[in-house]
Amino acid sequence: LSAASWRTQSIYFLLTDRFGRTDNSTTATCNTGNEIYCGGSWQGIIDHLDYIEGMGFTAIWISPITEQLPQDTADGEAYHGYWQQKIYDVNSNFGTADNLKSLSDALHARGMYLMVDVVPDHMGYAGNGNDVDYSVFDPFDSSSYFHPYCLITDWDNLTMVEDCWEGDTIVSLPDLDTTETAVRTIWYDWVADLVSNYSVDGLRIDSVLEVQPDFFPGYNKASGVYCVGEIDNGNPASDCPYQKVLDGVLNYPIYWQLLYAFESSSGSISNLYNMIKSVASDCSDPTLLGNFIENHDNPRFAKYTSDYSQAKNVLSYIFLSDGIPIVYAGEEQHYAGGKVPYNREATWLSGYDTSAELYTWIATTNAIRKLAIAADSAYITYANDAFYTDSNTIAMAKGTSGSQVITVLSNKGSSGSSYTLTLSGSGYTSGTKLIEAYTCTSVTVDSSGDIPVPMASGLPRVLLPASVVDSSSLCGGSGRLYVE
């Protein structure tokens, strides 16, 4: 699937080992602290696609599929998929190649898409970097394919980050020399075959900062699909240039400021506002970035705040701003795991509860986004405009003038009072009838061109023209504009 076609998708990210088991158990033990395989499988994903599709997601991103180091080390097992050894074999803990093809087929039968996590940067070895037996790697079976051993100690030194190794002295991550023609040829051929063999629609690329940038244009091109890269860094000046070599990157610059703005009622809205402007100016196309507030590498949002209103605000942001929304499995169940490995809880232990408060919130928010896309062909590429802030509130407009979606977010939390926010600068003219899509409340733009937005309990508000909502399946409308 092309980068342009990915703009309108929404992605549910899961670690295959932690989402669903082949036996469909919802009680099988998964102690995250043990850092071992918990029994998730590709068949387990297939069996619970209704749960994912029920939130309106159109795609899933699954953890890496390659054969991993087999040992149970002091750092645990390779259940996450980032310690690969044999790139032409699939991880048998998750099933067979046919099971993976069946997952791809099951998604496509629903009109959904498959994104696979890939790791061109490194392999994985159970042992010290000085003692690696390179013959265990297929096809990179000699040290000539790799950078000489040195651990990354200074993450601000880009040369070191690219040339030295991630990992530690228990599990070393031998760093492939991606400047070598032999390495490039193998990876470019491999990624083309991966996409072809499993009908893959998109790729998430791990550890992008650790690879020389000029490796990626050939890799992205060979894949023939949308590629979004991971750069775990909050600086748009260093992240955005990677859009010259990849379709998109994960939106870490927004992630950090979104977290800081909404983790408490004293969070900085102004820093988020400034970062929205920075990303818009520094990145060549913010609509191709991957938006998230949770993943498997950072503590969950609920670890910072247990407040449901604050959680709803950050979710509304990732869906209704520029970029492709990504939700990490368990986020919809308000999981609260801290840093790695505690943020890698088994989804099945929630019983796949479709009545959970954030499950239904995500479903509604996804429907609002799909309605905006259906109603306005320019919506998805229209630059999001953060046009109002106060100490607790940010308001944004996205879409063609006259049908723009107005999103109002608050960090006040569930104890926030009820009040009317007089919102100016939305671009709507006096007398325009709007509907707030979460509460189905009618609002009319006043004679000054201001919108009287009814705020309560620190909850987000999203306003669309009444004519658009009335033609949708939201708020008891006619359903003429198809929204799942």
From Swiss-Prot:
Intracellular or extracellular location(s): Secreted
Quote the cofactor binding remark: Binds 2 calcium ions per subunit. Calcium is inhibitory at high concentrations.
Q: Which reaction does it catalyse?
A: Endohydrolysis of (1->4)-alpha-D-glucosidic linkages in polysaccharides containing three or more (1->4)-alpha-linked D-glucose units
Q: Which residues bind substrate?
A: W83, H122, R204, L209, E210, G234, D297, R344
Q: Which residues form a coiled coil?
A: none
UniProt cross-references to CDD domains, sorted A to Z:
AmyAc_euk_AmyA (cd11319)
User: What Pfam families does the record point to?
Assistant: A_amylase_dom_C, Alpha-amylase
Per the record, the GO terms for biological process are:
carbohydrate catabolic process
Chief location: secreted
Q: State the superkingdom.
A: Eukaryota
Q: SUPFAM superfamilies, from UniProt?
A: (Trans)glycosidases, Glycosyl hydrolase domain
Query: What cellular-component terms does GO give this entry?
Result: extracellular region
Which annotated residues bind Ca(2+) 2? D206, E230
Q: Which cofactor does it need?
A: Ca(2+)
List the cysteine pairs that form cystine.
C30-C38, C150-C164, C240-C283, C440-C475
Q: Where is the active site?
A: D206 (nucleophile), E230 (proton donor)
Q: What is its EC number?
A: 3.2.1.1
PANTHER family, per the entry: ALPHA-AMYLASE, ALPHA-AMYLASE FAMILY MEMBER
Describe its partners and assembly state.
Monomer.
Q: What is this protein called?
A: Acid alpha-amylase
- Native species of this protein? Aspergillus niger
